Amino acid sequence: MATWNDLNDELNRWQDTGKDATFWWRDDDAIEPTDLLERLIQISSENTAPCMVAVVPHLAVPALTLRLNDAPTIYPAQHGYRHINHAPEGQKATEFGDHRNRTVLENELRDGWQSLQSFNRLAPIFVPPWNRMTDELNGYLRSIG
């Protein structure tokens, strides 16, 4: 198995040849400021490395908005609505699966998106909990932003 040193060595080789590495960096399940979130913000800031923070709209406290708004390298995104597993027993976890009423899903998506509008740099990206959602919502997501 590769180690962090292996990754660092590889990135150094890339740099030596003029290549840039592009990567996706995201933190999930944000609802309030925590020591770990603070550390993530610090690393992001020190390295000028933008980071997406997936915020659970229905659970997020006002202090999270204040803290993330003060962190210029942080980009909040909508992470579900309540982050509750609604999947039937025996199925993979999902909050936005096709087993739920479409109108309820659309209302939760819209309400969640609207509740996050006070975040600066809000990314127009939906991060479904457990990285699963019904494909039927793709068009609706585009329609709300």
Describe every region a protein language model picked out.
Residues E38, N138-G139:
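Short amphipathic alpha-helical segments
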Residues P50-E136:
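Metal-dependent polysaccharide deacetylase catalytic core of the NodB/CE4 family, i.e.
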Residues L141-G145:
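His/Asp/Glu-enriched short active-site or ligand-binding loop at hydrolase and phosphoryl-transfer sites
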Residues A2-Y75, S115-S118, V127:
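Active-site beta->alpha N-cap acidic-glycine motif
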